[in-house]
């Protein structure tokens, strides 16, 4: 999948993000094995734990019957509405991804200032995942 197409979709869904407590907004685009796209944005709540954009995209895909994935692109903004140089999944999201993705699953970040993409394998970001 072309990264530019993923970026356009990530920026679009980022606008729906709800982050009034952390002032940190995130958008993500998950790509299934058949190239279907699933979007996600973070949603914060004062009363319970928030849900990250990556897990929103995954649960959207899983509830639609998908279980096999190729890659995800993640972007974020800070409280000043400036794009972050790199937005990486939190530890909880990394472990969540391990449930559904192999070690070569790609995590793509984007640096808006430099107009560059960076790719990681899931295994690089979580080399020792929890397993039952």
Which residues make up each language-model segment?
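Compact, glycine-rich, soluble single-domain proteins
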Residues: 41-56
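C-terminal binding/interaction regions
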Residues: 2-16, 66-132
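Short capping/connector residues at structural and topological boundaries
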Residues: 26, 48, 127-131
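Short loop/turn motifs at secondary-structure junctions and domain boundaries
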Residues: 19-22
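Hydrophobic "anchor" residues
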Residues: 36-37
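Short beta-strand scaffold segments in enzyme catalytic cores
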Residues: 25-32
């Amino acid at each position: 999948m072309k990264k530019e197409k993923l970026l356009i979709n990530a920026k679009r869904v980022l606008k729906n993000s709800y982050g009034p407590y952390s002032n940190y907004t995130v958008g993500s685009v998950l790509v299934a094995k058949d190239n279907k796209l699933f979007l996600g944005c973070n949603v914060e709540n004062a009363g319970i734990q928030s849900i990250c954009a990556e897990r929103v995209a995954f649960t959207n895909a899983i509830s639609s019957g998908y279980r096999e994935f190729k890659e995800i692109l993640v972007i974020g903004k800070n409280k000043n509405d400036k794009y972050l140089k790199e937005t990486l999944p939190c530890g909880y999201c990394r472990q969540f991804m391990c449930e559904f993705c192999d070690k070569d699953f790609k995590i793509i970040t984007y640096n808006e200032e430099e107009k560059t993409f960076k790719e990681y394998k899931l295994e690089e970001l979580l080399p020792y995942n929890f397993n039952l």
